[in-house]
């Protein structure tokens, strides 16, 4: 788990005296880093007793064209990613990634690590 609270040190390096301990709601989690492979999901419990589906691996995408028609197709590879240029080489799927499909290039509109599904729109 990753703690997302304040640093224990000031910008000059001095230690800050602790007024209280850590809280569970201050914990974060590691990124899912969804890869292209056979579909693998993981259920995570969240605040309020809700569930979140982490998509760890996926090789299919729901692609919508300009006319609004949606079809399920396979993902070949990642050709662009504005989040991190190194994700292209590692074939990591994030929101905004440009992927190559048999229908053409598509841009991912969902958040695979939090939604549990990959949706995309076809680029012209």
Regions found by a protein language model. Name each.
Residues 1-124:
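Ribosome-associated RNA-binding proteins
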